[in-house]
Amino acid sequence: MSNEIKQIHATCIAIGDNGILLRGPTASGKSDLALRLIDAGATLIADDRVDLILGSKGVCASAPAILKGLLEVRNIGILQFPSKENAFVSLVCELVRPEEIERMPQYTNTCILGINLPHVLIAPFETSSVTKVQLALGLITGSIKLAHDKS
């Protein structure tokens, strides 16, 4: 297990103990979606840059010290929010345009630091995007099931 930190351009929030990594290009809506998730009860881990390290339970996300607790709220400013020190990443949300998402997508994984993590595409500015992130996490944690899943 390497103690090497990899810093990426992303945002990370936590729902309970589950870290959710929001990835996408500049101005794709990472901070905006994080703000709405925080409003729905999530906790900020890191905005704009996320430090990732391989830990005993998987990929652990944290904020660089200079950015701890800070979230950019476009047209308002950089604001201080309550935050968690770190969280293990349970879900990676790739922020894309709505037309890039299949109506009934196949579930995929993405590899980060040699660990395969569940990966979904999210259109961040859709009204339902916060709920979709919560539902995707529920599928991963087993708190909800797909209609065709009989297990």
Can you annotate each of these PLM segments?
Residues 7-8, 30-31, 78-80:
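A generic local structural motif
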Residues 10-12, 49, 107:
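Short, acidic/polar N-cap/turn motifs at the starts of alpha helices
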Residues 39, 43-97:
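Conserved nucleotide-sensing/catalytic segment adjacent to the nucleotide-binding pocket
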Residues 4-6, 45, 102-103:
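Short solvent-exposed loop/turn micro-motifs enriched in small/polar/acidic residues
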Residues 14-38:
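Glycine-rich phosphate-binding P-loop
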Residues 85-151:
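Conserved NTP phosphate-binding and transfer environment spanning the P-loop NTPase/kinase superfamily
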Residues 1-18, 23, 55, 139, ...:
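Extreme N-terminal, non-catalytic leader segments
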